[in-house]
Regions:
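A Lys-centered signature of the CheY-like receiver
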Residues: 100
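Non-catalytic signal-transmission and effector/linker regions of two-component phosphorelay proteins
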Residues: 1-5, 89, 103-120
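Acidic, metal-coordinating helix/loop segments flanking the phosphotransfer/catalytic sites
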Residues: 33-51
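Conserved acidic carboxylate
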Residues: 10
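Hydrophobic/aromatic residues positioned on beta-strands within the core alpha/beta folds
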Residues: 80-81
Length: 120
């Protein structure tokens, strides 16, 4: 993951910090974390990143519009959820996902499978 820029979209501070530490230890550069839908949309507009970890519920607001934009723009990303499959809209169910709380090894494996480095 060395040098891979990962945009972290997560509203829970301790979870975002855990993701930041795990990915940083693996050599990734962290963009964010950002905690709201508005901040996520702004980061997509302004930030340079290779892939995204996206929580689908940001401060009680659905981040589905963010996911839809990432799909439309062709970005590589994984959905993060603590609510399981029923919380994911049907049109997003085929996307890579990880359950919260994150298992650090599972998170790294998922991002390697997404091949974020080639996304650059």
């Amino acid at each position: 993951m060395s040098g891979t820029r990962v945009l972290v979209i997560e509203d829970e501070y301790f979870i975002a910090d855990d993701v930041r530490r795990v990915l940083s230890a693996a050599g990734a550069e962290i963009v964010g974390p950002v905690a709201t839908v508005a901040m996520a949309q702004q980061a997509i507009d302004q930030a340079n990143f290779d892939c995204v970890v996206l929580d689908l519920n940001l401060q009680g607001e659905s981040a589905v519009p963010v996911a839809d934009r990432l799909v439309a723009d062709g970005h590589v990303f994984a959905i993060a959820t603590g609510y399981g499959s029923p919380a994911i809209p049907e049109h997003l169910k085929g996307l890579p996902r990880i359950e919260k709380p994150y298992d650090p090894k599972a998170l790294l494996k998922l991002l390697e499978q997404l091949d974020c480095v080639k996304a650059r």
